[in-house]
Regions:
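Extracellular/periplasmic, surface-exposed regions of secreted and cell-surface proteins
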Residues: 114, 119, 160-161, 291, ...
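Short Gly/aromatic-enriched secondary-structure transition segments
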Residues: 239-241, 457-460, 527-531, 874-877, ...
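Extracytoplasmic gating/loop element in the C-terminal half of outer-membrane beta-barrel translocons
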Residues: 269, 464-466, 549, 876-968, ...
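Glycine-rich, aromatic-lined ligand/substrate-binding cores of catalytic
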Residues: 849-882
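Conserved small-residue
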Residues: 224-274, 526-530, 727, 746-849, ...
Length: 1020
């Protein structure tokens, strides 16, 4: 750098690299301000600034320079390459490679992006952070984690969860992954294509998420503490009728069906206005307090480094009497025994307790639980009686003709105890030797345990259908309770040898071979329901109390284990970082599969061309990176749900009576298949990475994945008895495109970093077992059978129902349109799809699918001096959701309350026909109107402001005065607002929790909460 005087208040110059070539797009900022510029195509710049100021010059891949300007100068600035940036490594399976040598589809999420979010677990923090990964928050229950999908669902009967690799330990246990304290995470790598994940073979078919936790750092001890306190509330309420509108509706209904004269008290109440206006959602929901705290100490020397942390989380649920508590500790050290020998130990223990509630379930309309009860309860009734008893319709309002089967949802919440405990441990130790330059030998041992227990107890007066008991008059004839307890452990041993060498400065080679061994064991025992003649406590310490007259049903137990081992190898080669080749091969064996197909081979290959490393690109400085990638690989899926799927099973059935003696009969219910093998995924990927002007980066990936799946196939009846056998039959295809755009539009005292991710996945069933055209047993409940359908040639999760086209308004309509059984004026008209003149199940037609057209996420970080603001937005376009819970409170069903759109939009007369989707109140043909139809179908589009966080970092001068290194205070809102057109709580619904075939059906699950928190972080 040379200085030459020139005019005042203006600095000009040129930015070059160490070869003297001008750099295009270098950022030149006046320190302490937002005043800045960038260098032009010739590397020149001009900046108006204070004569005594300082400028910062930066460019990707180069070391930032800071230059003090005393006068108006003409500057010649030479930037040196940042070797640390150029040699930045990316964690991949069983090691790490230089980022420039990556030829596969990998996304990175830094730990700092998620540690400050007030979420219950890591999965919630990943929402919207990367393309190609979908996280569906199907429940707002405290501690509940979203379902994770990497590039769609590739299996029908088996699991679709990705493989989690936690500090080198591979597991499909999502709970173990979500038990990690977010503040302990250094970074997360998401391996999306087969070439990056095939090194994990049979476990990697659904993608791989690699978690690296924080380790000890050289230096004097550093202590950090963070705490967050706040509250949660229901993000939205379902809009149901208020008391006046409800009274008008049920009086109209009973007038229409001719029964109004039987309920004079109802008319008297309406005329006098002597009734409540209870919001039952207010009664069951609350503002729930939450608290999180983490303390960490880290430090060490060149010989020994350590890191210890402890965390506590107390999260009350927005439903009464629900909560999640977690306490965790983590520790580890790393010792350099010599220049060539290293030893490391890590351990963690997590204790959690959760109180569950029953938001969903099944009754005569396949909907029960406190959510459906609260939405169905008449708003004219109080929550409590004057004597403190819970209001129960059967006990207190039988003369109003209301639904006697409805229970008070508040009593169900407060009088149930359904608790789950868990103590989980994870420990690992490794020993690493570098006998010669470039060669690393490493062996590691991991051991995890899980001790769990669940106790369920329901107060006596809540049982039975008589509903005769209450607080003041308990029904002591029965109680209900059960206990589940279990213990499992997993032992894992891995040994690798890695050789990394550079030949003639241009040939870079990284080769690795290894061996894995794993043993897993699980045991569970259940003590089933009991009925007592008294009302004792259901459980006393560790055993069921024994009461005279008690009937203790038989318990059950279950034990399973499996053994697994693997051999694998990987080679990464690049020529001068221009041309990259990567290949891997792996052979797995597992006792889960038949002896004849117990071993499986998995392999991959990938190529990359770093265009910007070519000599002819050296003068193009505005182009930071341009890389083409292509890969192909085969991975597997061993999450088949049964450790003994290939073995024959025996079941018992009806007893045969000989004289007066009943003899049980046994028969084969599952047939042996020694040929049962792995689910396999074949995936191709084409990718392109580009970065320009040190400010904009774009990553695009196209992929196609074909999955050969395991599923049960029916045995022909001529074998003597019906049954099924697990076999390798059927194929699923997923193909799509992912785009991720990262930009830094502003730098300096005011900076803005933004990342937009967009993903589109198309899913299709290619074939099924026994040449079936439709997957059997896909149902959304007994009242919704054959609504969710899965056909060959179609995506999973098609929705078939009757299509509502209006209401019968006149006698002419009754004569013109086909009827669904008996129907009258004011009932719904359904489309006669097959034109046979009758409405029945044969008129079900394709009306939607749960899978979205595309998903997106948008992350923004704004920094102005010591203030920072982070905003995360995510959502989806396309797809549908069935609001099945609404059937339980359909218009005029037992005079329960209803959705406002149905109640206020109901048919009233031939001149007031309502919204065309709601029949008249008091119809005598209720069953003909409330079956599966498009009246329950809604678009699943949504845009959610997922996270907003505002922080302030105190000035170092102030921190020094109070004796700390730094301090940050923050305020955060999680799930601030959701924009959608859905009347339920959330469109992210799933009938079977994690199902790929029965998704998109909402039975009134636990609502997602809006959470406000205030945080404090400081370091010593």
């Amino acid at each position: 750098m040379q200085g030459i005087q020139q005019g005042q208040n203006k600095v000009t110059g040129i930015v070059k690299d160490n070869a003297g070539i001008p750099i295009v797009g270098a950022t030149i900022m006046e320190k302490g301000s937002t005043n800045g510029t960038v260098s032009d195509l010739d590397g020149n710049f001009s900046l108006q600034m204070n004569s005594q100021g300082t400028i910062l010059i930066s460019y990707i891949g180069y070391i930032t320079q800071e230059i003090k300007v005393d006068k108006n100068d003409k500057l010649i600035i030479t930037l040196e390459e940042d070797t640390e940036t150029l040699d930045e490594v990316v964690v991949v399976g069983y090691g790490a490679i230089q980022k420039r040598s990556v030829s596969t589809a990998i996304s990175t999420v830094k730990g700092g992006k998620i540690s400050e979010m007030p979420t219950s677990n890591i999965s919630q923090s990943l929402v919207g952070m990367s393309s190609g990964i979908t996280l569906q928050q199907i429940s707002g229950e405290p501690g509940a984690a979203p379902a994770i999908r990497v590039r769609g669902a590739g299996s029908i009967n088996s699991g679709n969860d990705p493989l989690f690799v936690i500090d080198g330990y591979p597991t499909t246990d999502a709970e173990l992954f979500n038990n990690i304290n977010p503040a302990d995470i250094a970074d997360i790598q998401i391996l999306k294509d087969a070439a990056s994940s095939a090194i994990y073979g049979s476990k990697a078919g659904n993608g791989v998420i690699i978690v690296t936790t924080k380790q000890g750092q050289t230096g004097k001890p550093k202590v950090s503490f963070s705490t967050q306190v706040g509250w949660s509330e229901a993000q939205n309420y379902v809009d149901v009728l208020e008391a006046d509108d409800y009274m008008d509706m049920i009086i109209e209904a009973r007038t229409n069906n001719g029964s109004i004269q039987n309920f004079p008290k109802l008319i008297q109440m309406r005329e006098s206005g002597n009734y409540e206006n209870t919001n039952w959602q207010d009664a069951i929901f609350r503002n729930a307090l939450n608290y999180r705290g983490t303390a960490t100490i880290t430090g060490g020397t060149e010989i020994l480094k350590y890191n210890f942390s402890a965390n506590y989380q107390n999260e009350d649920g927005i439903l009464l009497n629900s909560f999640y508590k977690r306490v965790g500790i983590k520790g580890g050290f790393e010792a350099n025994l010599s220049k060539k020998i290293k030893l490391g130990v890590n351990f963690s223990t997590t204790y959690s307790k959760r109180r569950l509630q029953q938001p969903t379930g099944g009754n005569t309309e396949d909907v029960t639980g406190v959510i459906a009860q609260a939405l169905s309860m008449p708003p004219i009734l109080p929550v409590y009686q004057n004597n403190g008893d819970y209001t129960q319709i059967a006990q207190h309002y039988a003369d109003l003709g209301l639904n006697n089967q409805l229970r008070n949802p508040v009593s169900n919440l407060l009088e149930n105890r359904n608790d789950k405990w868990s103590i989980r441990t994870m420990s690992n130790a490794y020993f690493e030797v570098k006998p010669i330059k470039g060669l690393t030998l490493r062996t590691s041992v991991n051991f995890t345990t899980n001790a769990a227990k669940q106790d369920y107890y329901q107060s006596a007066f809540l049982l039975g259908k008589s509903y005769t008991g209450n607080k003041s008059t308990p029904d002591l004839t029965s109680i209900d309770g059960y206990r589940l307890s279990g213990f499992g452990y997993n032992a894992y041993w891995s040994t690798t040898a890695t050789y990394d060498v550079t030949l003639k400065e241009k040939h870079h080679l990284n080769a690795m071979i290894g061996y894995d061994f794993e043993y897993n064991s699980d045991f569970e025992v259940q003590q089933d329901d009991r009925t007592d003649s008294d009302n004792p406590i259901a459980y006393n310490n560790t055993s069921i109390t024994n009461v005279n007259g008690a009937k203790l049903w038989t318990g059950s137990s279950e034990y399973s284990n499996y053994v697994f081992d693997a051999m694998f190898a990987r080679l990464v080669y690049d020529y001068n970082y221009k041309y990259v080749f990567s290949g891997s091969v792996r052979r797995d064996r597992s006792s889960k599969f038949g002896p004849d197909k117990r071993a499986g081979w998995f392999y991959s290959g990938s190529l990359a061309w770093n265009i910007t490393e070519e000599d002819f690109m050296k003068d193009i400085h505005w182009l930071d990176i341009a890389k083409l990638r292509a890969s192909y690989g085969i991975t597997g899926n061993d999450q088949i749900g049964n450790d003994y799927a290939w073995i024959s099973t025996i079941s018992s059935d009806q007893n045969v009576v000989f004289g007066t003696t009943a003899i049980p009969t046994y028969y084969p219910s599952g047939y042996s298949n020694r040929q049962l093998g792995w689910e396999k995924n074949k995936q191709m990927d084409l990718g392109f990475d580009i970065g320009v002007f040190n400010a904009l980066n774009i990553v695009v990936d196209l992929y196609k994945r074909t999955s050969d799946i395991v599923m049960p196939a029916n045995i022909p009846n001529f074998n003597g008895i019906a049954g099924s056998v697990y076999m390798n039959a059927g194929q699923i295809e997923n193909k799509g495109i992912e785009i991720q755009v990262s930009a830094t539009p502003f730098k300096g005292d005011f900076s803005w970093e933004t990342t937009l991710s967009w993903s589109k996945n198309n899913n299709k069933i290619l074939s099924l077992a026994n040449n079936q055209n439709q997957l059997a047993n896909a149902s959304a409940g007994t009242k919704w059978g054959n609504v969710m359908r899965n056909y060959v040639g179609r995506p999973m999760g098609d929705m078939y129902m009757l299509k509502v086209i209006g209401t019968f308004n006149t006698e002419k309509d009754l004569a013109q349109y086909a009827k669904n059984g008996t129907q009258d004026i004011g009932d719904l008209i359904f489309e006669d799809y097959n034109k046979d003149g009758t409405i029945d199940v044969n008129d079900y037609q394709l009306v939607g699918n749960y899978q979205p057209d595309f998903t997106f996420g948008w992350n923004n970080t704004f920094i102005y001096k010591d203030f920072d603001l982070a905003v995360t937005i995510d959502g989806q376009c396309g797809g549908n959701v069935i609001y099945a819970a609404a059937r339980a409170f359909s218009l005029n069903r037992y005079d329960d309350n209803v959705l406002a759109e149905s109640g206020l939009g109901r048919w009233k007369s031939s001149t007031d026909t309502g919204n065309g989707m709601s029949h008249k109140a008091g119809t005598n043909n209720l069953g003909s109107n409330i079956g599966p139809s498009t009246r329950y179908l809604y678009d699943a589009d949504f845009l959610r402001i997922r996270n907003v966080s505002l922080g302030y970092t105190l000035p170092k001068k102030f921190c020094k005065i109070i004796g700390i290194e730094n301090m940050r205070i923050s305020a955060n809102v999680q799930n601030l607002w959701t924009f959608d057109k859905y009347p339920g709580y959330s469109v992210e619904a799933n009938y079977e929790g994690n199902s790929a075939t029965n998704n998109g059906v909402d039975f009134g699950g636990y609502p997602i909460s809006r959470t406000f928190t205030f945080g404090l972080n400081f370091n010593f």
